[in-house]
Amino acid sequence: MPSSQRWNTMSSDRLFVYGTLMRGFDHPMARLLAGHAEFLGEATCRGRLVLVKHYPGLLHSEAPTDLVHGELFRLSVPEELLRELDMYEACGEGFPEPTEYLRQLVDVTRADGATEKAWTYVYNWPVTGLPRIESGRFLEH
């Protein structure tokens, strides 16, 4: 079961992004991430993507063929950056429940096959009627 979004010193300084926070997006939060995190490479996590308006939502999946493609970063100041990203994603303490996203630790696989834990934002609202991004790649939708 994924870990909750509460920060502690035993948590990961890794962040897996799969949508508008990826490199190349001209978005203020993508620029913040690019300026305060080290790009570690492309990565995948088990899950499915749905299109929510103009942005994606990641859903958990146990099926080995369900992969979401994205990018892995090492955060320079994890606690501060995650707080900023939580505000952007409107999740965590102080936001009405249920929040649209939950920040959770997931297993990600790097291009070299190594796996590690990373934070990501998992979609938390009903998905009825939302189109699935079959490729698992937001940029290909």
Regions found by a protein language model. Give the residues of each.
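Glycine-aromatic micro-motifs
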Residues: 2-141
